């Protein structure tokens, strides 16, 4: 397409290089004319390339490997052209430059290359030039970009590009050794060219002595005849064996001498192989090697060639592990799987979603329709190892899991011997003594053999294709740009596995930090798809065992045939509750949902995982679950006693300040434990709290999340609301309720649980709900606006300390509501009722309670009179 323009640019460059002295004699006019001619020719190439790039970004699917390769090729060319324009302009003194020459390079072209949004470009003043932005300091430039509406990612991307351009152009077009810049925050290909592509520009044309930084970007090997535009970029690229995947085999080529000597590079024997020079950043402890001369023959074949070079044998310093680069990214195809969430935002369109897809490689979450617009997938090397304590689970007495030993693949380079293994860190004292030993964070081999793979509390042995859930690795913010995958290169690499230990990165899944989600939850969500009985023990040439999460699920699975179902004892929005027997008396919660719907089944298994990790005296004991469709059920211990709802409304029961305090403290202990585990109850109310002989047990936590998929017969234009449910809902939830929206889409949070506890606290004092005999429409307005709560607080007389707790829990702003730990401290400040049973007033008070059915009076404590029929409430 632009071959003729490239030849013209090459001829102009040769004239510039050959007639330097004549140009100097000709004066400034000749230099200006030559610079204008060069910039004009380059601008034509830029316009042609930008037109092609615009078509690729708008008309083609960016998730396609071929499209990604073409986009990177054009972006690489455009960056080279713009930097060449800047260097041509800088070759002329500022006083001799004309207005036409100063207009190069165009700022709009630079912004388009890095994929700045059009609305941001429109806000940028027309008079602003690239030179003016280069002269600004980092803070000022970032502030201006933000003022024009640029996002944080766009600001960071442009700042890195400008920093590199400053280093190149600040030398007046003369390239020096220290002008190179290696990116530490690489970006996605859809957001602009890789930053490492720019780093090679600062090293173009430099002397060939000493080691250089290595760019890991997959720059295309072009057959361009312009030596000045291609040499500087090509000689610093890492051969990624066509696929762009950086493997240990590719790492060996960093330190491998050329198979073809420099004197024979023009001989017609066979295409030469051109390994790059060693990198200071990848191997900081390696001895310096002389820089290898770049071969110019067969340049067009280097990008599509797999070089089988023989690694050079050398000795590393004793005990020095290889340092893996943190900015290495691998370009792969998305591996989407269907997912369901309680509340999630699409990473592409930024809209809320319940059902969608998630990439198992880069953990991208989006709608199914947004996959065409999703950015390219990346797998990152995980640089640091962090230990995580293994949760203890009971042995599976119903479904024993066969955990056979599994072969392990080495991940250490051959140069590292057994004596040079890094020292292992000690595990937590609470961990299983047979747990897998971890290596130091800088070690490239964090996977070692477990001493007891058959233990019930020990997760499966890790392999290169599987993550051990006890190890968590902090991710970097983004992944480096790399060349697209090639199926041929993948198969070739796997065929060569006996020769070179290759890490199967296509099976490894990199983790990304997600706001508000622990790594354990992320693992559960990613591996909750299938039970281990339906998973294959071998997947591809590299083995991969069932995940630890799926093993946990099978250990808690109870065959429905073993459960004896009794009479129904309750009905919830998600199904019926039956009394039953399974090694004793249990409560069986049958879920009325389509078990053959994979999305619903995954959501159910996720709730099982939430139940599995709970162990507290004030939380119902989880015993297992029936997970074989169509029989889906959660089995818990049977709660004796009465619900708190019926207990406080029974006029025969006596509730003094000590008893209400004790009940509230028990509820706070259980809720505080759930919140510490990262579990939001979502349906805390007096009907879900059982009270028996002074003991409080909280039930049905988390089940509210699946109520939206259970009650599918609802009408789209109607809201079915119960009075007892509205009284426990926080204002921010009531304001989000619209017809057709499922309950699991509402913004439930820990603060919403605190609000619900406020209503329970009110019931303990007043023995009724705060709003009575009002239609649902009136309750929605009173709760959503906060007016009804203010009226209740102003009209009721419950005492200072009780009112403070109530007003704190019912705060309109969720940020002002206290945590359950603070609520416990507030309860401790309540006055205590210390009166002996032999006090004369005790018998009179008891008779008064039984006769008039009113609560005792505590005027001496300032608590006022509480009656069950108070008309003010």
From Swiss-Prot:
Residues that bind Zn(2+) 2, according to the entry? 346, 349, 367, 370
Can you tell me which residues bind Zn(2+) 1? Answer: 334, 359, 362, 377
**Gene3D superfamilies, per the entry:** 3.30.60.20, 6.10.140.1120, Phosphorylase Kinase, domain 1 (3.30.200.20), Transcription Factor, Ets-1 (1.10.150.50), Transferase(Phosphotransferase) domain 1 (1.10.510.10)
Pfam families per record: PK_Tyr_Ser-Thr (PF07714), SAM_KSR1_N (PF20406)
Which enzyme type, at the first EC level? transferase
Q: EC number(s)?
A: 2.7.11.1
Q: Where is the composition biased (Basic and acidic residues)?
A: 506-519
Residues that bind ATP? 569-577, 685, 700
Acidic residues bias locations:
520-530
- Record note on what altering residue 587 to V does: No effect on ATP binding and MAPK1 and MAPK3 phosphorylation levels. No effect on the interaction with MAP2K1
> Impact of changing residue 395 to A on the protein?
No effect on phosphorylation of S-392 by MARK3
**Tissue specificity as recorded in UniProt:** Expressed in brain, spleen and testis. Isoform 1 is highly expressed spleen and weakly in testis, and isoform 2 is highly expressed in brain and weakly in testis.
Start-end of Phorbol-ester/DAG-type zinc fingers: 333-377
Catalytic activity field: L-seryl-[protein] + ATP = O-phospho-L-seryl-[protein] + ADP + H(+); L-threonyl-[protein] + ATP = O-phospho-L-threonyl-[protein] + ADP + H(+)
> How is the protein modified post-translationally, according to the record?
Phosphorylated on Ser-297 and, to a higher extent, on Ser-392 by MARK3. Dephosphorylated on Ser-392 by PPP2CA. Phosphorylated KSR1 is cytoplasmic and dephosphorylated KSR1 is membrane-associated. Phosphorylated by PKA at Ser-838. Phosphorylation at Ser-838 is required for cAMP-dependent activation of MAPK1 and/or MAPK3.
Q: Where is the composition biased (Polar residues)?
A: 206-216
- What does this chain do? Part of a multiprotein signaling complex which promotes phosphorylation of Raf family members and activation of downstream MAP kinases. Independently of its kinase activity, acts as MAP2K1/MEK1 and MAP2K2/MEK2-dependent allosteric activator of BRAF; upon binding to MAP2K1/MEK1 or MAP2K2/MEK2, dimerizes with BRAF and promotes BRAF-mediated phosphorylation of MAP2K1/MEK1 and/or MAP2K2/MEK2. Promotes activation of MAPK1 and/or MAPK3, both in response to EGF and to cAMP. Its kinase activity is unsure.
Q: What quaternary structure, including any partners, is listed in this protein's UniProt entry?
A: Homodimer. Heterodimerizes (via N-terminus) with BRAF (via N-terminus) in a MAP2K1/MEK1 or MAP2K2/MEK2-dependent manner. Interacts with MAP2K1/MEK1 and MAP2K2/MEK2. Binding to MAP2K1/MEK1 releases the intramolecular inhibitory interaction between KSR1 N-terminus and kinase domains which is required for the subsequent RSK1 dimerization with BRAF. Identified in a complex with AKAP13, MAP2K1 and BRAF. Interacts with AKAP13 and BRAF. Interacts with RAF and MAPK/ERK, in a Ras-dependent manner. Interacts with 14-3-3 proteins including YWHAB. Interacts with HSP90AA1/HSP90, YWHAE/14-3-3 and CDC37.
Q: What is this protein called?
A: Kinase suppressor of Ras 1
Native organism: Mus musculus
Q: Which gene encodes it?
A: Ksr1
């Amino acid at each position: 397409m632009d071959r003729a323009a490239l030849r013209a640019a090459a001829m102009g460059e040769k004239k510039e290089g050959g007639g330097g002295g004549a140009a100097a004699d000709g004066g400034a006019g000749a230099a200006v004319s030559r610079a204008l001619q060069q910039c004009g020719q380059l601008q034509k190439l830029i316009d042609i390339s930008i037109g092609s790039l615009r078509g690729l970004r708008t008309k083609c699917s960016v998730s396609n490997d071929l499209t990604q390769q073409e986009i990177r090729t054009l972006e690489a060319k455009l960056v080279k052209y713009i930097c060449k324009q800047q260097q041509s302009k800088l070759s002329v003194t500022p006083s001799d430059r004309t207005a036409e020459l100063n207009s190069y390079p165009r700022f709009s072209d630079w912004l388009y290359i890095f994929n700045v949004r059009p609305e941001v470009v429109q806000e940028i003043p027309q008079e602003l030039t690239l030179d003016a932005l280069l002269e600004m300091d980092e803070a000022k430039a970032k502030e201006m970009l933000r003022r024009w509406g640029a996002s944080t990612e766009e600001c960071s991307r442009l700042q890195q590009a400008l920093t590199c351009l400053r280093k190149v152009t600040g030398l007046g077009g003369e390239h020096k050794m220290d002008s190179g810049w290696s990116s530490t925050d690489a970006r996605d290909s859809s957001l602009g060219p890789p930053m490492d592509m720019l780093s090679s520009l600062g090293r173009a044309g430099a002397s060939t002595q000493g080691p250089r930084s290595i760019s890991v970007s997959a720059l295309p090997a072009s057959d361009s005849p312009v030596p000045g535009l291609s040499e500087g970029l090509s000689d610093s690229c890492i051969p990624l064996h066509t696929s762009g995947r950086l493997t240990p085999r590719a790492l060996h080529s960093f330190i491998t001498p050329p198979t073809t000597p420099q004197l024979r590079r023009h001989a017609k024997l066979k295409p030469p192989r051109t390994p790059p020079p060693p990198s200071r950043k990848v191997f900081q402890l390696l001895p310096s090697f002389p820089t290898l001369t770049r071969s110019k023959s067969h340049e067009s074949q280097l990008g599509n060639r797999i070089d089988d070079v023989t690694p050079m044998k050398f000795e590393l310093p004793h005990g020095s592990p290889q340092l893996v680069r943190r900015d290495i990214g691998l370009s792969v195809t998305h591996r989407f799987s269907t997912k369901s969430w309680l509340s999630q935002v699409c990473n592409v369109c930024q809209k809320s979603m319940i059902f969608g897809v998630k990439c198992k490689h880069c953990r991208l979450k989006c709608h199914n329709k947004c996959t065409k617009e999703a950015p390219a997938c990346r797998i990152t090397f995980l640089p640091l190892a962090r230990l995580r304590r293994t949760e203890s689970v009971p042995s599976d007495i119903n479904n024993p899991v066969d955990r056979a030993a599994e072969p392990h693949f080495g991940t250490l380079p051959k140069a590292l011997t057994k004596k040079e293994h890094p020292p292992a860190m000690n595990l937590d004292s609470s961990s299983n003594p047979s747990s897998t030993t971890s290596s130091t964070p800088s070690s490239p081999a964090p996977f070692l053999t477990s001493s007891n793979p058959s233990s019930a509390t020990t997760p499966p042995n890790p392999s290169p294709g599987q993550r051990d859930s006890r190890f968590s690795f902090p991710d970097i913010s983004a992944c480096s740009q790399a060349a697209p995958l090639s199926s041929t290169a993948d198969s070739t690499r796997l065929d060569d596995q006996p020769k070179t230990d290759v890490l199967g990165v296509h099976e490894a899944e990199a983790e990304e930090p997600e706001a508000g989600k622990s790594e354990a939850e992320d693992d559960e969500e990613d591996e909750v798809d299938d039970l281990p009985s339906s998973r294959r023990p071998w997947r591809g040439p590299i083995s991969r065992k069932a995940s630890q999460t799926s093993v946990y699920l099978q250990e808690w699975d109870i065959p429905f045939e073993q459960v004896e179902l009794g009479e129904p004892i309750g009905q919830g929005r998600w199904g019926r509750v039956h009394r039953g027997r399974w090694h004793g008396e249990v409560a069986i919660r049958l879920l009325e949902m389509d078990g053959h719907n994979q999305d619903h089944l995954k959501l159910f298994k996720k709730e099982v995982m939430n139940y599995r990790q709970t162990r507290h005296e004030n939380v119902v004991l989880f015993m297992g679950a029936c997970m074989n469709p169509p029989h889906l059920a959660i089995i818990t211990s049977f709660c004796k006693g009465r619900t708190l709802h019926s207990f406080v409304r029974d006029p025969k029961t006596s509730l003094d300040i000590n008893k209400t305090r004790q009940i509230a403290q028990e509820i706070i202990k259980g809720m505080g434990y759930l919140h510490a585990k990262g579990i939001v109850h979502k349906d805390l109310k007096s009907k879900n709290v059982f009270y028996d002989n002074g003991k409080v047990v909280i039930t049905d936590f988390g089940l509210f999340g699946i109520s939206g998929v259970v009650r599918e017969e609802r009408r789209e234009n109607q809201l079915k609301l119960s009075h007892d449910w509205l009284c426990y809902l926080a204002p921010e939830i009531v304001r989000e309720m619209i017809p057709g929206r499922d309950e699991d889409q509402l913004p439930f949070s820990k603060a919403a649980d605190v609000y619900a506890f406020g209503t329970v606290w009110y019931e303990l004092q007043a023995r009724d709900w705060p709003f009575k005999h009002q239609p649902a429409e009136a309750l929605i307005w009173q709760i959503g606006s906060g007016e009804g709560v203010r009226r209740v607080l102003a009209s009721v007389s419950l005492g200072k300390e009780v009112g403070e707790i109530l007003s704190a829990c019912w705060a309109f702003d969720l940020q002002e509501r206290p945590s359950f730990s603070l609520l416990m401290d507030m309860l401790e400040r309540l006055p205590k009722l210390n009166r002996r049973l032999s006090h004369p007033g005790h018998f009179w008070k008891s008779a008064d309670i039984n006769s008039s059915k009113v609560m005792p009076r505590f005027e001496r404590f300032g608590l006022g009179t509480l009656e069950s029929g108070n008309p003010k409430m």
